[in-house]
């Protein structure tokens, strides 16, 4: 009995036979032959490269290759075992119809020794090694392979070596065009076609094209909302089996992929790979439109939709459209009121898993992402990224209408409504309308007088958490917002914005009634009330109304008699901070208001105004 060579496993075609094959069949033939040769080379059987392989690698027509032109390979495989892992050859048989024989277990007495083997056991060792070559041929019956605690049944390909490689997590085959790597050479070959293959599979629904028919099939499910893969545990359904497999890990809680840098563990190796980029700062996914780079291909896909304005997922309830199907799913919960994510600690429920994750940190108090510039810590890396822009002054989000730039995309979205004038959220109590639902929620607290945010230092309460945060800086003296022009620091970003206009002199908000211009849009809104006579802030004690909430707050002190602003020099107290500031001048002797006519100085601006009448 002879030994198996590459000649024995190669399939040949005449010119007539080759011309009967279509492009897909020719490509399949080429892939099978190259894969067979690589398997022999891997075991050290194929030493020199046959002419057929050279021809196929150069993508030339192999029909004119004759069997005697193929270089005979050194002996390597025992034909007894080869019958079980390689198909019978013959030009008359189509390579597509070749079926791998079922492997029959045989006892020691039935084993034929490989030429050169000294014992049955040695021959058996060779046999075990060749089981890994069973690839690229369809089998008539699946075989099972136990790996750790997993039992996998292979119906399409019998390849134990491939299975083992997946579990060692080694990815030796790297793509030259990008940073992606693969555990199998065939996977790399398939991936490379992204760069070379024409996207011939087109979606009739939206016109999107794909490299693979299978990808098109998966994509079509986004339009039909078909989700055939259902979780038995919670009933959640998925449109792809891979997403279903990923979801199942959430029930087991297993996270075998650990980051060596920070110790964080993940359920998927791909998630670990993406996570590592936080430490390395690597952003391999670049937008060809604007040059912006991302650490994840999914983030790049989302970003690209900003350029084309694509929003394929539409809500049937209200007509609102979204970039992602997952965003649509979350949005639908606003209409249904569904809150599937429940906190085990306090039983609070949420409509989004991300909100539950954020909420959980309230119980742990963990803030792992720290700013190197000022030491401030954050729950999320994205929040840290946004915070850093305060220090760098970066404003990547620009309004196409007026050119104004912003630190955050959400701020740009808010700003755009200024141009449209749309205010869809209306207060049922007073009729006031707002751009955002959050602003309406905050406004309603004026009517209910609810102030849930209390200062631990002085017990003062606020209706907004942001107002409490700003207030706390009075006690700490923190002023994180610094002017690059003059170095002056402020406790609020809005105050810094207003201050910067002193240097530029810009007053972009103009009153259409009288032409007066203002630095801030909020100041313009307050000014307009002079013309309209609107006074929305009413004192419950005496019924007096005011056009500004600050004036109402000052007025209320008349009824309470409270004087919170005390002079450290003489102990005199005042109901306004401005009155205290004016009073302090008595102790310092400062007279900042000077007459240009005679040089006389005054403590008060009103006194200077009266004095000027002497000259006129």
From Swiss-Prot:
Cellular component annotations (GO), alphabetically ordered: nucleus
Record domain KRAB: where: 4-75
GO molecular function: DNA binding; zinc ion binding
Entry keywords, A to Z: DNA-binding, Metal-binding, Nucleus, Repeat, Transcription, Transcription regulation, Zinc, Zinc-finger
Compartments, record wording: Nucleus
Classification via SMART domains: KRAB (SM00349), ZnF_C2H2 (SM00355)
A Pfam family per the record: KRAB
GO terms classed as biological process: regulation of DNA-templated transcription
InterPro entries: KRAB, KRAB_dom_sf, Krueppel_C2H2_ZnFinger, Znf_C2H2_sf, Znf_C2H2_type
ZnF (C2H2-type) intervals: 173-195, 201-223, 229-251, 257-279, 285-307, 313-335, 341-363, 369-391, 397-419, 425-447, 453-475, 481-503, 509-531, 537-559, 565-587, 593-615
Main location (coarse class): nucleus
Family: Belongs to the krueppel C2H2-type zinc-finger protein family.
Functional summary from the UniProt entry: May be involved in transcriptional regulation.
Protein name according to UniProt: Zinc finger protein 726
Taxonomic source organism: Homo sapiens
């Amino acid at each position: 009995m002879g030994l198996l060579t590459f000649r024995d496993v190669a399939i040949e075609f005449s010119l007539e036979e080759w011309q009967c094959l279509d492009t897909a069949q020719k490509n399949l033939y080429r892939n099978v032959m190259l894969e067979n040769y690589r398997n022999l080379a891997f075991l050290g059987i194929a030493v020199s490269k046959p002419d057929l392989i050279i021809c196929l690698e150069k993508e030339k027509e192999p029909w004119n290759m004759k069997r005697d032109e193929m270089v005979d390979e050194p002996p390597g495989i025992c034909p007894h075992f080869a019958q079980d892992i390689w198909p019978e050859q013959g030009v008359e048989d189509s390579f597509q119809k070749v079926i791998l024989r079922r492997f029959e277990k045989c006892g020691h007495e039935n084993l034929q020794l490989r030429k050169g083997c000294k014992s049955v056991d040695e021959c058996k060792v060779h046999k075990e090694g060749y089981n890994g070559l069973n690839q690229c041929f369809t089998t008539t019956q699946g075989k099972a392979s136990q790996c750790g605690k997993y039992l996998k049944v292979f119906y399409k390909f019998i390849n134990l070596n491939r299975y083992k490689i997946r579990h060692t997590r080694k990815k030796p085959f790297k793509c030259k065009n990008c940073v992606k790597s693969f555990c199998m050479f065939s996977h790399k070959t398939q991936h490379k076609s992204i760069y070379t293959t024409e996207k011939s599979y087109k979606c009739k629904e939206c016109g999107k094209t794909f490299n693979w028919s299978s990808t098109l099939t998966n994509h079509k499910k986004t339009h039909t909302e078909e989700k055939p893969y259902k979780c038995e545990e919670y009933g959640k359904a998925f449109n792809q089996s891979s997403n279903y497999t990923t979801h199942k890990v959430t029930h087991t809680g297993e996270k075998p992929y650990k980051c060596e840098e920070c110790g964080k563990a993940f359920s998927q190796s791909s998630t670990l790979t993406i996570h590592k980029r936080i430490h390395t700062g690597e952003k391999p996914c670049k937008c060809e439109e604007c040059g912006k780079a991302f650490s994840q291909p999914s983030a790049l896909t989302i970003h690209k939709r900003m350029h084309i304005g694509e929003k394929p997922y539409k809500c049937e309830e209200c007509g609102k459209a979204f970039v992602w199907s997952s965003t649509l799913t979350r949005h639908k919960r606003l209409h249904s009121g569904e809150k599937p994510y429940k906190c085990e600690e306090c039983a609070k429920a949420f409509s989004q898993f991300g909100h539950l994750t954020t909420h959980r940190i309230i119980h742990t108090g963990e803030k792992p992402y720290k700013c190197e510039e000022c030491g401030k810590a954050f729950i999320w890396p994205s929040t840290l990224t946004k915070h850093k822009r305060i220090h760098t002054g970066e404003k990547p989000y620009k309004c196409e209408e007026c050119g104004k730039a912003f630190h955050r995309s959400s701020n740009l979205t808010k700003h755009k409504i200024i141009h449209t004038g749309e205010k869809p959220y209306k207060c049922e109590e007073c009729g006031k309308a707002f751009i955002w639902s959050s602003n309406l929620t905050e406004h309603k607290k004026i009517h209910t007088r609810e102030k849930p945010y209390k200062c631990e230092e002085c017990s003062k309460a606020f209706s907004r958490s942001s107002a409490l945060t700003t207030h706390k800086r009075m006690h700490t003296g923190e002023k994180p917002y610094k002017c690059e022009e003059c170095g002056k620091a402020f406790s609020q970003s809005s105050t810094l914005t207003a201050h910067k206009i002193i240097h530029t002199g810009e007053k972009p908000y103009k009153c259409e009634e009288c032409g007066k211009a203002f630095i801030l849009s909020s100041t313009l809104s307050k000014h307009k009330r002079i013309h309209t006579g609107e006074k929305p802030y009413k004192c419950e004690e005496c019924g007096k109304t005011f056009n500004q909430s600050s004036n109402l707050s000052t007025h209320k002190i008349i009824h309470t008699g409270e004087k919170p602003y005390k002079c450290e020099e003489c102990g005199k107290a005042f109901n306004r901070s401005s009155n205290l500031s004016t009073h302090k001048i008595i102790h310092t002797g400062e007279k900042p208001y000077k007459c240009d006519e005679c040089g006389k100085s005054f403590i008060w601006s009103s006194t200077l105004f009266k004095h000027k009448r002497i000259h006129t």
